[in-house]
């Protein structure tokens, strides 16, 4: 299996031929190379990913990320197995409370998150959570109601959170251009003040444009 990739066909250097297509051999040697293209989420499909021996979901497509988003477990663990493409389709935030998400050095591309009060790849963190080794590239994150808390990675935090080796870029804006955002940040939209919780951010950066009022 080539994680996150779809087989397109065979190329002779000038033309790509689909699997099973007829080909007339010329009077010379020809070298063919397999052509693979990145899998892109269709905006609808959710597919259950496999779990490894330690109980981590192994996510290799946008459809598997969509399934992970829709699970109800509060003790989730997941790893990205490859770069994944979200196709620019609207994606509701992941609504898990906490646990562990390891990007394993991979990138999420084409992410277009749309939500209401708390908006980001992760909607809100309310218990112990670790997010690490993840890049989100050129995301668009939109809030659809007044008073929203918006970040590319996490919308709102009211639990203990560690974020390490995470890099995000993109745009934060209101869904219709008129909603008022309460708080926004490239990485995290808002962190609530509670004495028994801690938020640690290590070796991370954000390059975000924030639009709206």
Where do the PLM segments sit?
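Surface-exposed interfaces of beta-sheet-rich extracellular modules
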Residues: 1-21
């Amino acid at each position: 299996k080539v994680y996150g990739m779809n087989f397109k066909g065979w190329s002779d250097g000038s033309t790509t031929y689909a699997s099973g297509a007829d080909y007339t051999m010329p009077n010379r040697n020809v070298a063919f190379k397999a052509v693979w293209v990145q899998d892109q989420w269709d905006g609808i499909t959710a597919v259950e990913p496999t779990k490894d021996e330690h109980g981590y979901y192994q996510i290799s497509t946008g459809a598997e990320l969509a399934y992970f988003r829709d699970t109800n477990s509060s003790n989730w663990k997941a790893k990205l197995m490859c770069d994944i493409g979200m196709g620019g389709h609207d994606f509701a935030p992941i609504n898990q409370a906490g646990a562990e998400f390891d990007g394993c050095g991979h990138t999420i591309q084409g992410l277009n998150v749309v939500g209401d009060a708390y908006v980001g790849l992760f909607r809100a963190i309310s218990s112990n959570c670790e997010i690490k080794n993840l890049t989100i590239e050129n995301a668009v994150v939109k809030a659809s109601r007044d008073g929203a808390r918006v970040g590319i990675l996490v919308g709102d935090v009211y639990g203990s959170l560690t974020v390490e080796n995470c890099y995000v870029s993109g745009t934060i804006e209101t869904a219709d251009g008129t909603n008022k955002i309460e708080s926004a940040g490239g990485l995290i939209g808002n962190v609530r003040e509670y004495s028994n919780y801690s938020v640690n951010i290590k070796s991370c950066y954000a390059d975000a444009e924030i639009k709206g009022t």
